[in-house]
């Protein structure tokens, strides 16, 4: 067992965090980032680069020293010159790496999102099984909870909720709506002594033990799965006996776990989750919302674990990483020959001694490939892999704290001292007081031509008339400029009573001079004379298009002797209700009282 603890001893944190070094933009960020060793680019590629540069200089020695002895230098030079133009075109490194790294990062992100954390489950369990209640044990030696906690020193606490024994429980055990909270209750176990001696014996907090056990089972399910997909967790918990020594399992639970898992080929992480569901069903009514919420969050816990398991079972198809890794390594294998400095006389070039540009290309391309290799399995032992052991410890500690020591506790409720302005506080010497500004829209503080968003303070307001009737058009005010008012309409001339009225014009003349949207009630020859006279009196007379308008744009006044009725002004012309429109050039024979004015289609 001590060997397991030595293996798990954390000398340094595996996941490298560098956010503090790049908290502000500065010229020192590059130096700060490049100063890291664990998880760095240099650490991941220096071995392969050392092998490559040694092979490069070995081939350089053969080409410059050995080949001239046998007279093969010119032949090798021609072969290498023929390879060089086709090297970059036949192996598309950027294309292969781009798609591959994108796919790997997407799987890495999904794996990170599916790592379950215990906080939401602990809050839901604490809400589903609230309060505390103690039951007197029969023997003082049997005072250990399943997790190994010694309960002999735990003092008695108040009981806020009764114990629910199931359908056989008496009706008095269920709280009525509005009933006061019950006092502390100590329920004796069968065969336990009665009287003062029973109060002095140790007791077990049933609800507290249930909450702690559910959290322990959830963390246990996480450990059982991580042992199958992570080598770091496997080294910490070599076998199930290590879980008993670490108090994640009891001896009785280990026997049940060993008996129920008949086949070693399948995982067993679902059994502790099943136990947690059973405990939750025993301590809560199913119809309560808190029970449903706790059920859902535990189900989400299982779903995330199953997604992690499926991602480990079915990785990216093997041919894809093989093609990418082989293409990159073969490319730089060819570079050992094609990037040689072939001109023996040009000794001033830096490539004559060291391949500078090829080395930079090797660092960038191979480093890019190493990123994909590291992220391909984030459950491994690389520097930037997930810290699963730390996640297990955190889930256990935080979960037990929420359902045990911090359950049902809060500070005393007092009135806050925040003012009505609710302004944030900054120290007087803090630069953030001047830097921090409100997050508002990008065009909120732009003032165009002195206008404001408040209508009362706006110097010019737009009025838009969308009425389809055009008899009385509404003027449009733009930028405070109002059009000149129209002159008042001229009153119609009074008819001369001494002169007889002229005969009505024939229907053909009216039909020829009629505009498209005019409303004319045609009086036929078969209509009654009285009705025809009434229709003539009510029908408007169209102005003559040959007549000229006055200086104000209105039609001239027409005497009653020349026309049957004066034309009203265009601005004051109102629709005449009982009037029949023309249909297909013929007036509909209807009474003036029954005629209707159709709506203007425009």
Curated annotation (Swiss-Prot):
UniProt superkingdom: Eukaryota
InterPro entries the UniProt entry points to: Bestrophin, Bestrophin-like
A Pfam family hit: Bestrophin
Disordered: annotated span: 477-602
Record-annotated membrane-spanning stretches: 50-70, 85-105, 313-333, 356-376
Record's subcellular location: Cell membrane
Principal cellular location given in the protein's record: membrane
Bias kind Pro residues: ranges: 482-507
Record's GO cellular component terms: chloride channel complex; plasma membrane
Bilayer disposition of the protein: Multi-pass membrane protein
Keywords: Cell membrane, Chloride, Chloride channel, Ion channel, Ion transport, Membrane, Transmembrane, Transmembrane helix, Transport
Molecular-function GO terms, alphabetical: chloride channel activity
Basic and acidic residues bias locations: 510-520
Role played: Forms chloride channels.
Similarity comment: Belongs to the anion channel-forming bestrophin (TC 1.A.46) family. Calcium-sensitive chloride channel subfamily.
Quaternary structure note: Forms oligomers.
Protein name: Bestrophin homolog 25
Organism listed in the record: Caenorhabditis elegans
Annotated gene: best-25
């Amino acid at each position: 067992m001590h060997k397991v603890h030595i293996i798990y001893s954390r000398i340094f944190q595996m996941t490298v965090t560098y956010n503090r070094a790049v908290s502000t933009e500065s010229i020192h960020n590059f130096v700060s980032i490049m100063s890291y060793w664990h998880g760095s680019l240099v650490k991941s590629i220096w071995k392969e680069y050392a092998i490559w540069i040694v092979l490069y200089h070995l081939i350089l020695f053969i080409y410059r020293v050995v080949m001239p002895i046998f007279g093969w230098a010119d032949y090798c030079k021609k072969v290498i010159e023929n390879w060089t133009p086709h090297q970059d075109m036949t192996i598309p490194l950027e294309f292969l790496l781009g798609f591959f790294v994108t796919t790997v990062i997407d799987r890495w992100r999904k794996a990170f999102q599916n790592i379950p954390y215990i906080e939401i489950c602990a809050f839901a369990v604490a809400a589903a099984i609230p309060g505390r209640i103690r039951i007197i044990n029969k023997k003082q030696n049997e005072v250990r909870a399943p997790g190994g906690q010694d309960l002999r020193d735990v003092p008695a606490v108040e009981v806020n909720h009764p114990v629910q024994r199931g359908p056989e429980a008496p009706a008095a055990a269920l709280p009525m709506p509005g009933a006061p909270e019950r006092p502390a209750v100590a329920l004796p176990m069968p065969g336990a002594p009665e009287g003062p001696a029973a109060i002095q014996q140790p007791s077990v907090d049933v609800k507290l033990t249930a909450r702690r056990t559910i959290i322990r089972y959830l963390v246990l399910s996480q450990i059982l799965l991580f042992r199958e997909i992570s080598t770091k967790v496997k080294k910490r918990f070599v076998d199930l006996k290590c879980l008993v020594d670490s108090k994640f399992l009891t001896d009785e639970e280990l026997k049940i776990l060993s008996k129920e898992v008949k086949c070693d080929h399948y995982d067993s992480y679902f059994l502790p989750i099943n136990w947690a569901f059973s405990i939750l069903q025993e301590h809560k009514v199913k119809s309560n919302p808190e029970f449903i919420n706790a059920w859902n969050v535990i189900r989400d816990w299982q779903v995330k674990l199953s997604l992690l398991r499926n991602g480990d079972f079915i990785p990216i198809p093997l041919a894809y990483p093989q093609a990418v890794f082989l293409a990159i390594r073969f490319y730089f294998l060819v570079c050992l020959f094609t990037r040689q400095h072939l001109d023996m006389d040009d000794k001033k070039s830096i490539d004559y001694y060291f391949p500078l540009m090829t080395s930079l290309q090797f660092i960038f391309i191979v480093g890019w490939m190493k990123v994909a290799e590291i992220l391909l399995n984030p459950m491994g032992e690389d520097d930037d892999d997930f810290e699963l052991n730390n996640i297990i410890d955190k889930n256990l500690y935080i979960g037990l704290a929420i359902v045990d020591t911090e359950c049902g506790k809060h500070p005393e409720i007092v009135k806050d001292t925040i003012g009505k302005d609710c302004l944030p506080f900054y120290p007087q010497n803090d630069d953030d007081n001047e830097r921090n500004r409100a997050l508002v829209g990008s065009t909120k503080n732009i003032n165009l031509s002195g206008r404001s968003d408040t209508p009362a303070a706006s110097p010019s307001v737009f009025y838009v008339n969308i009425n389809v009737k055009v008899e009385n058009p509404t003027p449009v005010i733009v930028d405070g400029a109002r059009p000149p008012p129209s002159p008042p309409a001229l009153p119609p001339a009074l008819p001369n009573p001494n002169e007889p009225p002229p005969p009505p014009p024939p229907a053909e003349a009216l039909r020829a001079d009629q505009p498209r949207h005019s409303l004319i009630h045609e009086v036929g020859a078969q209509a009654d004379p009285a009705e025809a006279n009434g229709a003539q009196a009510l029908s408007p007379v169209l102005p003559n298009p040959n007549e000229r308008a006055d200086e104000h744009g209105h039609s001239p006044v027409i005497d009653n002797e020349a026309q049957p009725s004066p034309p009203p002004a265009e601005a004051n012309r109102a629709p005449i209700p009982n009037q029949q429109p023309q249909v297909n050039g013929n007036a509909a024979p209807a009474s003036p009282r029954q005629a209707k004015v159709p709506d203007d289609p425009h």
